[in-house]
Design a protein with these regions (language model features):
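Functionally critical transmembrane alpha-helices in membrane proteins and complexes, commonly lining
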Residues: 11-14, 18-20, 36-91, 108-111, ...
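Solvent-exposed interhelical
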Residues: 177-206, 246-258, 328-332
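Interfacial loop-to-helix transition and helix-capping segments at the boundaries
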Residues: 2-11, 36-39, 64-75, 161-175, ...
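Juxtamembrane transmembrane-helix termini
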Residues: 20-27, 71-106, 110-133, 318, ...
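Membrane-interface helix-loop-helix regions
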Residues: 112-175, 284-287, 291
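Short, Lys/Arg-rich, polar N-terminal cytosolic tail immediately upstream
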Residues: 1-2, 17-37
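Alpha-helical transmembrane segments of multi-pass integral membrane proteins
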Residues: 3-18, 264-356
Length: 367
């Protein structure tokens, strides 16, 4: 235990002092080996995506399906993985143009696809006549709001799904984009002022942000404060917890056998033991990235395209469509199977026909 505490203290001091070699921000040497080599990030993405799918299926249909992780935790998990992988990607090539192009190619095509599919498909499920639907002010408000990632302005389509949100998963996209925007800024600040003080400022700010809007929500009962709590200020904790593990990866790898069970206990008892909730983001990052590092059974999945992003984007409207068809009234199991198969089918088609060609530079190439 003494050696662990000693070396952990050394690692904190090491990061606090900072290390600049050839003008590059320091990173754990083994992090690159794990990211580019054998890891199970793909299966973790699938697990998180299905956690969100099951969570939304349960809420929308009222059918009590169980999954070992809540949709809220799954969203936090996605932010952690982004903080680890996206920050690493930027550190390898800190060119703004390259970074922007890579992020745009990854997130924009399937997003535009599902928004377009929803408002065009709305013609078929809307209770309004086609002409009234197409010239509805609500439709054009939906189109403008959703193409600009401001989904909260108009989440519903005219006459569709009894006025409920068409795709309740899209709210995280604007948060994800804003987190991406912070990466070059934080990278610059870490190079200038060293990582440790920058992490401290980020974690303190995000914690205070969460506490403020949690208090206001509890005090006033106004849900707007709960919504604000979930925005980018509150998610910085999770995103940069992933980044912190990245920068400390050599130490993380050395002490994973001790850190992992401690992190699991922190996550499990976070609501029961005071103060644990404040270190839960970092503990969750240790658990997720530890699983990616240690679980080798699913390494083979790296050979195939990952459609987890598609599952996340497409499942919500598929669930709404299944309700519109009335499948849930006939069989809960059939309804769930329809949602899973329909979501997977859309995700695979999107990957093969849209995402993969764009990512491989076969379309929209800048060359």
């Amino acid at each position: 235990m003494w050696y662990f505490l000693r070396d952990t203290l050394y690692s904190i001091v090491f990061i606090g002092v900072g290390m600049r070699t050839s003008g590059k921000l320091w990173i754990g040497k083994s992090a690159g080996e794990v990211i580019q080599g054998e890891n199970s990030f793909d299966i973790i993405r699938y697990f998180l995506s299905f956690a969100v799918l099951v969570g939304h299926f349960r809420v929308i249909t009222g059918i009590p399906y169980y999954f070992p992780m809540s949709s809220v935790d799954a969203v936090h998990g996605f932010f952690i993985l982004s903080g680890f992988l996206v920050f690493y990607s930027y550190m390898r090539n800190p060119d703004i143009r390259h970074y922007t192009e890579r992020r745009t190619r990854r997130i924009l095509p399937p997003y535009v696809f599902i928004v377009t599919l929803c408002w065009m498909g709305g013609v078929l499920v809307s209770t309004l006549p086609v002409g009234e639907y197409l010239f509805s002010a609500q439709l054009w408000k939906y189109i403008a709001a959703n193409y600009s990632f401001l989904n909260f302005i108009e989440p519903a389509l005219p006459g569709c799904f009894q006025g409920e949100a068409v795709n309740g998963s899209l709210w995280t996209m604007k948060v994800e984009i804003l987190l991406y925007i912070t990466v070059p800024i934080v990278y610059y600040l870490m190079k200038k002022y060293r990582p440790f003080p920058v992490f401290i400022v980020i974690f303190i700010f995000s914690t205070l942000y969460n506490e403020l809007f949690y208090y206001l929500n509890e005090k006033t009962g106004n849900e707007i404060f709960g919504i604000l709590k979930r925005q980018v200020g509150g998610q910085l904790l999770y995103f940069y917890s992933g980044t912190l593990v990245l920068l400390c990866f050599d130490y993380f790898r050395r002490y994973i056998k001790f850190l992992f069970p401690v992190a699991v206990l922190v996550c499990y008892f976070r609501y029961d033991v005071p103060l644990l909730i404040y270190v839960e983001p970092l503990a969750f990052a240790v658990v997720l990235i530890g699983c990616a590092y240690y679980i080798k059974w699913f390494v083979f999945m790296r050979k195939f395209g990952n459609v987890a992003y598609g599952i996340y984007l497409f499942h919500f409207p598929v669930i709404q469509f299944s309700i519109w068809l009335g499948i849930n009234e006939k069989s809960h199991i059939l309804c769930f199977a329809f949602c899973v198969v329909g979501t997977l089918l859309l995700s695979v088609l999107s990957w093969l026909l849209l995402e993969k060609p764009i990512l491989s530079n076969r379309v929209f190439s800048s060359k």
